[in-house]
Amino acid sequence: NRSVNLNTRDINVTTDKNLRATETWLTNNSCPVDNPHFAVLELSTKAVKLLYAHSEQAVFSSSEFNFKNFVPDGRKTETGKGLDDQNVMDMDFFRARVLPVICNMKRVMKREGIDVVYSVATAAYRTAKNREEIIECIKSEADINVRILSKKEESVATMFAYGISTKYKKEIQESSHTIMIDQGGGSTEVSVFNQG
């Protein structure tokens, strides 16, 4: 199995630990919840996207993945347009265009009773030379931890998500080789999956 991301800047999983926090508890986590209601927040080059289950019971009792069990919410932010020609994010742009959407998504999660959110960021965040400042801004202003995905993590996540959610799942499982190309707003991932 091979995955290639054609974006040039990456995350070093050893040294960039401050960019690797994923989980944020929105409820009091000093009282652990047996079956927390969770959400995924994706901060992409083009948008901020939220996905959470209508009911975890429906998701986990279903024999296969079904988008009908989830509530998708997304807002176009054009985050990548805040990067200058040196790949530095204009923080005024970020605070005006992106941060309000993240804060609004947090309000939605609280209203929907989400206990924990897993937040990931992709190419624009990974590429930004001031990515630490961006992540700190999100943490201080929205109180949300964010994990910037490495190029490989983004490729593998795309391949996994497509593999469980596509109507061509059977064909993928029966194929000896599968090639996937994900052209996103700020990166292109090429994933090759070999069975056996």
Give the location of each predicted region.
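Compositionally biased, intrinsically disordered low-complexity segments
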Residues: 7, 14-16, 171, 175, ...
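Non-catalytic pre-domain segments flanking phosphatase-related domains
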Residues: 2-36, 41
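A short acidic Gly-Thr/Ser loop motif
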Residues: 41-47, 180-187, 195
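Conserved phosphate-binding loops in N-terminal lobes of ATP-dependent enzymes
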Residues: 32-145
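A broadly tuned preference for mixed-charge, low-complexity surface segments
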Residues: 99-108, 112, 166-186
